[in-house]
Each structure stands twice: as C-alpha cells, then as structure tokens.
From Swiss-Prot:
Gene Ontology BP term (one): adenosine catabolic process
Protein's gene: MAPDA
Protein name per UniProt: N6-Methyl-AMP deaminase
Gene3D superfamilies linked: Metal-dependent hydrolases (3.20.20.140)
Biological function: Catalyzes the hydrolysis of the free cytosolic methylated adenosine nucleotide N(6)-methyl-AMP (N6-mAMP) to produce inositol monophosphate (IMP) and methylamine. Is required for the catabolism of cytosolic N6-mAMP, which is derived from the degradation of mRNA containing N6-methylated adenine (m6A). Catalyzes the removal of different alkyl groups not only from N6-substituted purine or 2-aminopurine nucleoside monophosphates but also from O6-substituted compounds in vitro.
Nucleus found in the keyword field: no
InterPro entries in the cross-refs: A_deaminase_dom, Ado/ade_deaminase, Metal_Hydrolase
Source species of the chain: Homo sapiens
UniProt binding sites for N(6)-methyl-AMP: H26, N28, H74, S106, T107, P108, R109, D148, G181, E211, D293, D294
Residues engaged in binding Zn(2+): H24, H26, H208, D293
Glycoprotein in keyword set: no
Enzyme class per UniProt: hydrolase
GO MF, any single term: adenosine deaminase activity
Length: 355
C-alpha cells in the first residue's frame, strides 16, 4: 500500500518539470489573462473586459457560448502586430510550463479595418515562432493552418492553397492542416475535396470530429480520409452517435486522439472528469495525447491537464511519464525531430522521476 502511495504523483512540481508535447492548441484560445489585459488596454473602445474571454474555475459554458467567446477574442487580435505579440506570449507561456514541442493551430483571417490579409496573418505567426527561437526558448514550435467550418468549402480551398505555399516555403514549420470551428455548421462532405488536396500535397491532417452527439455519418466521412490525428473524438465510443464500428475503425488504423479534459468539461460536452473518454481510450492502450485546446479560455495549462488525468484515473508517475514520452510518436514533425525529443526526455528522466 505504501509503495502505491509513493508511486502516486503528489507534487504539482512533478507535472511542471515533466517534459511535455502540446499537439492541440488554438492560438486565439490560448491567450493568457496577462496578454488579454494588454490587448484590452490597446482597444478600450471595444468595451471588452477580461471576464468575457475566460471561463474561470468551477464555471461552465455551452459549446455555442464558447464559440461566441472566440468571436470576442478575434476583435482583440485584429492586426499583424497583435498576432505577433500573442504568438510570442503564448509560446513563452507553454515553454515556462515545460512544453518542449508545440504545434499551434490557427485560421488565417482577413481584417479590412487594419489591412491584415490572410497571408500577413500567417507571416505574423511565423515571425513570432522565429523570434521565440532567436530568444533561445527551450521549445520547438510548428504551425498547423486551420480551416474553419464556418467559412465553407470555397474558403477552405483558399486556406489549403495558402497552407501548401507555406508548407513548401517554411522548411517544416508549417506541417499540416486542422479542420475545426463550430461542429454544428456545415457538412463534412463539403470539405472532402480541399482536405484530400491538402493530403495529396503532403500536409498532415488533424481533424476535429465527433465533438457533438449523433454525427455518425459525418464522422465516418472524415475518418475515411484517414486523418493523421483526431481532435476530441468525444462521442466516438458513446451510445449517442458513436458506435463500435467507429471505435473499431479508429483502433484498427491506430489514429491518435488529442484529448482535452478541462475543455470538454467546461464546454459541457463531457459531464465530469471521471466520465471523460480519456479513461476509455487509455484503458485499451490506444494512442492518446493530453492537450489543452484553449488554455486561455479554459483557464488551464498542460501541467494541470496531466495532473487532472493522473488524479482522475489514478495514474502513477511512471504512467504519466510514459504518456508524455509516447506523445512524441504522434507529432507531425520529422523522425529526426522525434529522436531529438526522445533524447531530451531520456536526459531529463532521472531528474524528473527521481529514480
């Protein structure tokens, strides 16, 4: 019994010292309250206060309300300068939390009022990544260009074209494409053509799917693309719109899942932490990665997500370490990056695990 207790992760510093990989982080949803205050101060005429952009401890919102929050945040990040500042701050915060490899995702946006184009939007993020690298932060950052379902298939095609251009010109910084946005808007079949085009061009696909119940057909259409990773997959294994067929398909193809506990509980797609689908996928040893989704909006950080998973599902420190180490397998960067990260983890292991 005592041994088991010793194995239980008890100190918060274990989680922050743990080297981590973050694979599901939306840029505009990851803005901390510190950065948000700076943005709000620059735009007093908008009359936005920081309580409009965060869901504090113990609070919940509907999924619809969460998407409305993003609209509010977009009003604050309307210029290339805003995007650059936000990118640098978000990267620094992830690095401070022990994240060694980060894939940020964001939808290119045009803002006529400031003259920001979709291209300058992407370039601002890339500049933020570049400047962070020059500051010698201990974090490797990549960018997935996101397709927002609300934009429809024509905008999706434009976004894919942009992603292809940057995929070719950035030497591995732009690695893939994300399909996200309000899951109640649009239909999967409308996005098949642009997504297939992206895949053909060599871009990796991370697709949000099965975020809401009763979407079996929609989910199967997206799964048939054989995405490289699945975002959320909340209802794949549920009686409401999930099915054994879907679970078997995901298992058979070993498609990794990006799982975000606080996000799902606070947006009420999952009733409680102990009912989170991480428990199901982890119990069958399926590739699963703990992620934050929107660390700003949901007032969390990756260390906290690991701690929540460990405490909810009774994971030992060794199991938590393995969960983090195995997440390296599912990054979109090259094999050489994977082996660099594994070296880093192995170097840190004796210090973090206190073996």
């Amino acid at each position: 019994m005592i041994e088991a207790e010793e194995q239980q992760p008890c100190k918060t510093d274990f989680y922050s010292e743990l080297p981590k990989v973050e694979l599901h982080a939306h840029l505009n949803g990851s803005i901390s309250s510190h950065t948000m205050k700076k943005l709000i101060a620059q735009k007093p005429d908008l009359k936005i206060h920081d309580q409009m952009t965060v869901i504090d401890k113990g609070k919940k919102r509907t999924l619809e309300e969460c998407f409305q929050m993003f609209q509010t945040i977009h009003q604050l990040t309307s210029s290339p300068e805003d995007i650059l500042m936000v990118t640098k701050d978000v990267i620094k915060e992830f690095a401070d939390d022990g994240v060694k490899y980060l894939e940020l995702r964001s939808t290119p946006r045009r803002e006529n009022a400031t003259g920001m184009t979709k291209k300058t939007y992407v370039e601002s993020i890339l500049e933020g990544i570049k400047q962070s690298k020059q500051e010698n932060l201990d974090i490797d950052v990549r960018y997935l260009i996101a397709v927002d379902r609300r934009g429809g298939p024509l905008v999706a095609k434009e976004t894919v074209k942009l992603a292809e251009e940057f995929f070719l010109s950035t030497e591995g910084t732009v690695l893939g494409l994300d399909l996200s946005g309000d899951p109640t808007v649009g239909q999967a079949k409308d996005f098949l053509e642009p997504l297939l085009e992206a895949k053909k061009a060599g871009l990796k696909l991370a697709l949000h799917l099965s975020e809401i119940p009763n979407q079996k057909k929609e989910t199967q259409i997206l799964l048939d693309l054989l995405p490289d990773r699945i975002g959320h997959g909340t209802f794949l294994n549920s009686g409401e719109g999930g099915s054994l067929d879907l679970v078997d398909f995901v298992r058979q193809h070993r498609i990794p899942l990006e799982l975000c506990l606080t996000s799902n509980v606070k947006s009420q797609t999952v009733p409680s932490y102990d009912q989170h689908h991480f428990g199901f996928w982890y119990s069958i040893a399926h590739p699963s990665v703990i992620c934050t989704d929107d660390k700003g909006v949901f007032a969390t950080h990756l260390s906290q997500e690991y701690q929540l998973a460990a405490e909810t599902f009774n994971l030992t420190q060794s199991q938590v370490w393995d969960l983090s180490y195995e997440s390296i397998n599912y990054i979109f960067a090259s094999d050489s990056t994977r082996s660099e990260l594994r070296k880093k983890w192995n170097h840190l292991k004796p210090r973090v695990l206190h073996i």
